[in-house]
């Protein structure tokens, strides 16, 4: 079992298989980076899987595949099958923008993927274009429909932004609700790579807008989930992810691995340790030691909240949020 210095059990590994993305979302990466990491610098799926086995043996029980956009990496379904075959009881999920999902959903399901988180920030094509930098909405919605059709469980993520999509929170909630998908509204996480024009809705503003349409009660946090959940009078639940809240980090159970082999204890901070050398050399003992060191050095909380809140210098497209 992996336990950090604040007595939090760390059992969730997020793996970014690529930093590349086919969107240029305003809140993440509106401009193309000066250069992508050369593909030869990325760990192969076999190397990533070697570390996955180490992590599972040390106590990891949930794995999420992220990017960038993970579906841009060729043969992703084969990597998922490696994990599933080794540990079929692992909670195996993926976060995607769904642009390429229609043609890949069945393969992912057959490989052992169980759940998806999909970003749907709007239901208006012109707003989707403004957010993502290209015409994406039809592909995204077609991908979601296909994922549901093949039996994948889907959650929706939405980042409400003033003067852009905030007026659509009810529409996207209803879209999700009618299809049996939980929606989580995510407060915009300030970072130096995002557009300077963005102003995100805070949770109190969001709740005030939703109360004009619904009655609901606060159910609090669901285990180690980053979402605070609310239950509507008809039983439907929606979540709000509040990185600025005092309780956001209290039960954090996750670490992140980049495609280059950097193991990151916290989304907010730049600090990381590399497992690349030990994995390439097949040194399982050394890789386990790095894993335990990263868990031991997880910070208590991020620095978004409070009067002295800071802007993160982390490139979220490298770590998958």
Swiss-Prot record:
Main enzyme class: lyase
Pfam families hit by this protein: Fer4_12, Mob_synth_C, Radical_SAM
SMART domains: Elp3
EC id: 4.1.99.22
Cofactor binding, note field: Binds 2 [4Fe-4S] clusters. Binds 1 [4Fe-4S] cluster coordinated with 3 cysteines and an exchangeable S-adenosyl-L-methionine and 1 [4Fe-4S] cluster coordinated with 3 cysteines and the GTP-derived substrate.
Amino acids binding [4Fe-4S] cluster 2: 249, 252, 266
Keyword Transcription (UniProt): no
Cofactor dependency: [4Fe-4S] cluster
InterPro entries (alphabetical): Aldolase_TIM, Elp3/MiaA/NifB-like_rSAM, MoaA, MoaA_NifB_PqqE_Fe-S-bd_CS, MoaA_twitch, MoCo_biosynth_MoaA/MoaC, rSAM
Any GO BP annotation: Mo-molybdopterin cofactor biosynthetic process
Family per similarity comment: Belongs to the radical SAM superfamily. MoaA family.
UniProt name for this protein: GTP 3',8-cyclase
Organism: Sulfurimonas denitrificans (strain ATCC 33889 / DSM 1251)
Gene behind this protein: moaA
């Amino acid at each position: 079992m992996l336990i950090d210095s604040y007595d939090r059990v760390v059992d969730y590994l997020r793996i970014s298989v690529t930093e590349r993305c086919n969107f240029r979302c305003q809140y993440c990466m509106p401009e193309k980076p000066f250069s992508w990491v050369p593909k030869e610098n990325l760990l192969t799926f076999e190397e990533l899987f070697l570390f996955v086995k180490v992590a599972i043996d040390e106590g990891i029980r949930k794995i999420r595949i992220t990017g960038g956009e993970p579906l841009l990496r060729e043969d992703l379904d084969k990597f998922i099958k490696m994990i599933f075959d080794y540990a079929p009881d692992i909670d195996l999920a993926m976060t995607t923008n769904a642009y390429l999902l229609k043609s890949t959903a069945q393969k992912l399901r057959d490989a052992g993927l169980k759940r998806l988180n999909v970003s749907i920030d709007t239901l208006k094509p012109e707003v989707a274009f403004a957010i993502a930098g290209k015409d994406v909405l039809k592909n995204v919605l077609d991908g979601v429909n296909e994922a549901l059709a093949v039996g994948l469980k889907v959650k929706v993520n939405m980042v409400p932004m003033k003067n852009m999509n905030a007026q659509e929170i009810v529409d996207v909630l209803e879209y999700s609700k009618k299809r049996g998908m939980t929606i989580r509204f995510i407060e915009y996480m300030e970072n130096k790579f995002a557009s300077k024009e963005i102003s995100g809705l805070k949770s109190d503003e969001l709740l005030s807008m939703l109360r004009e349409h619904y009655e609901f009660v606060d159910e609090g946090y669901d285990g180690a989930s980053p979402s605070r959940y609310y239950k509507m009078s008809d039983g439907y639940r929606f979540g709000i992810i509040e990185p600025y809240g005092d309780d956001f980090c209290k039960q954090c159970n996750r670490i992140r691995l980049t495609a280059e082999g950097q193991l990151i204890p916290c989304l907010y901070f730049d600090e990381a340790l590399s497992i690349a050398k030990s994995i390439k050399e097949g040194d399982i003992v050394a890789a386990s030691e790095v894993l335990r060191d990263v868990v031991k050095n997880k910070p208590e909380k991020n620095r978004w909240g409070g009067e002295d809140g800071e802007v993160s210098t982390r490139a979220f497209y490298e770590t998958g949020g």
